[in-house]
Amino acid sequence: MKIASVDIGTNAVKSKIFETTPTSIKFIDGIRSPIRLGAEVFEGGKISDKKLRELVSTLKRYQKKFTKDKIDQYEIIATSALRNTTNSEEARTYIENKIEHPIRIISGLEEAQLIGFHPKAQKENNKAYVDVGGGSTEIYIYNNPKHSIQSFQLGGVRLMLKKDKRKEWDRLDKWLKQFNDITEIIGLGGNIRAFLNAHKLKKMKSDDFLKKYKNLRNLEIEEKINKYGFANDRADVIDFGLKIYERIIKKLEIK
């Protein structure tokens, strides 16, 4: 059986396709389209008709691929940008009518809860799973038998547009204070993945991360593209996404 997921995010629309059996699931293919919904939402409060038409066109393209690849089932979810736009329900209804498929707008806490479905998330103590998106950051921590989840209105695009708020940083700091035995951060999301791939690494020590992040921050956007091969919509936002990881690393005193 083939299944697919579609994530309407703040910085891009992404899809992953999997082959499943009763006992296994295997990743087959992925698609990414750089539609930055968050720019309109965080600047003007709502998604424009033009951007909605662009989104619909992208989703229809995905649907054609699903038909061609004989996908048996797929789900479309939307996160920070669609839940924060002032025309959220109107936008969802418009998209659903155009693509003839339901869209589920999930809360930040639901996003954080979904991290718990990671195969290792409920087996590894003292590790923080951190998903930094374009509009929000979700954290999942498992300390047997306690599960802790939280969502914060801090994300790469939000920071880039200077729409983050001091009280949200304070809320993050206060929440992290309760954890004094976290030994490792598992980073999820496009920014940390691109950063590690750029250095041909799967993991790194916190000191090394902070040093390499500082070096990256000092580069111009074109330099990041030329040196690391980042896409335009990754090169301009990656510093801001990594800034959130930097804050969490320091607050949790990760070595």
Kindly give the residue locations of the regions a language model identified.
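Short glycine-aspartate micro-motif
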Residues: 3-7, 127-131
